[in-house]
Amino acid sequence: VQDYKMNNNVYKFFPQPVFSYQVDNYQNLNKKLKKFILDEFEKDKAGIKRSNINGWHSKPFRFEKGNIALEFAKIIEKYIFNSFQQYGWPFIAEKVKITEMWSIINKKNSFNESHIHPNNYLSSVYYVQAPKNSGNIVFNNPNPVSRNKFPLDIKKTEYSANIQKIQPKE
């Protein structure tokens, strides 16, 4: 195969970032969250059906004074604000709201189907527990044209990949 190396400019129009943060004091936080999630599971083993296949999905959390869901929401505010700043979005901190939060328990052969969270500026995921070999979080290219027709590629690049995976960490 002939190599066609050239000097050129590459303009990365409309990139789709995925921000990754390590939450401060996550080990202690994860212990509290795990207890809260398992308590929620014990109260409602049926859970609700959303994108989960063979896994458990909680009802949306109530942000009540003194519960870990509210504490967690306050802890992650600075990461949300940082993401807004990186996008260059003006915001008033008091007006930024988490619209919904829930937990998922996926065991072996459980997963979540590809889905979106509409009517939000950002979506996020936080892993309380992520054992080795528990699978990846998979992101699909949101550009609809990318799924229509594309040439066979020899090597996946940031320009040609329609799926990207990240190994979750606690």
Please state what every model-predicted region is.
Residues N28, K32, E100, I163-K165:
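Solvent-exposed, well-ordered amphipathic alpha-helical segments
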Residues S103-E170:
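Catalytic core of non-heme Fe(II) oxygenases with the double-stranded beta-helix
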Residues K34-I53, K97-L122:
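Short, charged N-terminal helix-start/capping segments
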Residues V18, E100, N136:
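A residue-level signal for beta-strand positions that form part of recognition/binding surfaces
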Residues V1, F14-Q16, K59, N143, ...:
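Intrinsic-disorder/low-complexity coil detector
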Residues D3-I92:
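Non-heme Fe(II)/2-oxoglutarate
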Residues N67-T99, K107-Y121, V128-N133:
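Active-site region of the double-stranded beta-helix
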Residues P15, I53, S58, K95, ...:
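Generic secondary-structure boundary/loop-capping signal
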